[in-house]
Every structure is written in structure tokens, then in C-alpha cells.
């Protein structure tokens, strides 16, 4: 047993040779056997196993210093599409924002004209409002599409009080308000204000 233990410990102590036992004439004798050097390469991946500091280590060898790991490369944002079909798609960035901007201008203009002339929305449209509507629509659509074709999104430039989310919500309320104004004036037959 002592010979086997000594033999196993000598494997680590003498990397160029190994002590072996041979049975010669019914007696065990130790022999030094020369072996070719063997390279060992560790290919483990992941985090190394950490030892519990409360348990004393039985190993006499010091752990090699850890190589500093480089940080992972930054994740690049996907490029935004600037194709006309993608911008005006149902889930694209342009339709709701453009319609909201038009509704905000339309709601304020309709209320202002009601206060100044006393006409309802339908009378305003029939008195030359179609030309103003088409001109405003073309101007706001073009002004809204130019930054989108350059790849600039409203979300990237929104800070402080006037954010892109606030613009979307104001546009949604203006769309509802304009429809509610027209419906109320149609049902009552007169102006709201």
C-alpha cells in the first residue's frame, strides 16, 4: 500500500518519469520508467469554481493569477428603415404622429373659427375650408416625413416636458376631440361654443 501511494505521488513530482513496481522472482521491486512528456491543456469554459474561504485548503500550490477579461462588445441598435412603405406602414412611425399633428391643428382651428365667426365645423368646411385642409395636410405631412427619411426618430429628440409620448397622447385626444366636436354639432344642429 505504501508503495502504491508513493508511486502515485511520484507521478506528480517527476513529470519526466514514473516509478513503477515489477514482480521479479516473487518480490516487488521499484523501477524508474522514463516516459515522453505529455502536454495537458484545460479547455473548461465558464466561471471557475470558487472555494469556501472557511475551509482550509490542502493544496500547497498557489492559484495562477486570473487574466482580466475584456468587456463584451457594445450591442449596436438595429438600423431604422427609411423606406417609404415602412414609414407609412400601419405600425410605422409616421401615420399616428402625422394624423395626431393634423388633428391638433384642426381642433384648435375649428374652435378658433367657431369663436370668431360663430359657424360650426360643417359650415367652415363648405366655406372654403377644404383648400386650407389640403394645404395644411400636405405641409405637415412633408414636414413630418423629412426627418424620418433621414433616419431621425422623434423618440430620440424628446426631453423634458415636451416628449414624444406627450405629443402622441395630445394627438390622440385631439383626434377624439375633433370627432366629438363634429358629432356633437351634427346632433345638436348648431355650434358647440
Curated annotation (Swiss-Prot):
Chain segment of the transit peptide: 1-43
Top-level taxon of origin: Eukaryota
InterPro entries reported in the protein's UniProt record: Chloroa_b-bind (IPR022796)
Protein name: Early light-induced protein 2, chloroplastic
Organism: Arabidopsis thaliana (Mouse-ear cress)
Compartment annotation: Plastid, Chloroplast thylakoid membrane
Main localization, broad class: plastid
Alphabetically ordered keywords of this record: Chloroplast, Membrane, Photosynthesis, Photosystem I, Photosystem II, Plastid, Thylakoid, Transit peptide, Transmembrane, Transmembrane helix
Biased composition regions of type Low complexity, renumbered to the chain: 54-64
Keyword Thylakoid tagged: yes
Residues that span the membrane, as ranges: 102-122, 129-149, 173-193
Expression triggers: By high-intensity light, mostly at cold temperature (e.g. 4 degrees Celsius) (at protein level). This high-light-mediated accumulation is inhibited by okadaic acid. A stepwise accumulation is induced when 40 percents of PSII reaction centers become photodamaged. Induced by UV-A, red, far-red and blue lights illumination in a phytochrome A and phytochrome B-dependent manner. The COP9 signalosome is involved in dark-mediated repression. Accumulates upon heat shock but repressed at continuous high temperatures.
Amino acid at each position: 500500500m505504501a508503495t502504491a501511494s508513493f508511486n502515485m505521488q511520484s507521478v506528480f513530482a517527476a513529470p519526466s518519469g514514473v516509478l513503477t513496481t515489477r514482480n521479479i522472482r516473487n518480490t516487488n521491486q521499484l523501477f524508474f520508467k522514463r516516459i515522453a512528456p505529455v502536454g495537458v491543456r484545460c479547455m473548461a469554459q465558464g466561471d471557475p469554481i470558487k472555494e469556501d474561504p472557511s475551509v482550509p485548503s490542502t493544496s500547497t500550490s498557489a492559484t495562477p493569477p486570473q487574466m482580466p477579461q475584456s468587456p463584451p462588445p457594445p450591442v449596436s441598435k438595429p438600423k431604422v428603415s427609411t423606406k417609404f412603405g415602412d414609414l407609412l406602414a400601419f405600425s410605422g412611425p409616421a401615420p399616428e404622429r402625422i394624423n395626431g399633428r393634423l388633428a391638433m391643428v384642426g381642433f384648435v382651428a375649428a374652435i378658433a373659427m367657431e369663436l370668431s365667426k360663430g359657424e360650426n365645423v360643417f359650415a367652415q368646411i363648405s366655406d372654403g375650408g377644404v383648400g386650407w385642409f389640403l394645404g395644411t395636410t400636405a405641409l405637415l405631412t412633408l414636414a413630418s416625413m423629412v426627418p424620418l427619411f433621414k433616419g431621425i426618430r422623434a423618440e430620440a429628440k424628446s426631453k423634458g416636458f415636451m416628449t414624444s409620448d406627450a405629443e402622441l397622447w395630445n394627438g390622440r385626444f385631439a383626434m377624439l376631440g375633433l370627432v366629438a366636436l363634429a358629432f356633437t354639432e351634427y346632433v345638436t344642429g348648431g355650434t358647440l361654443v
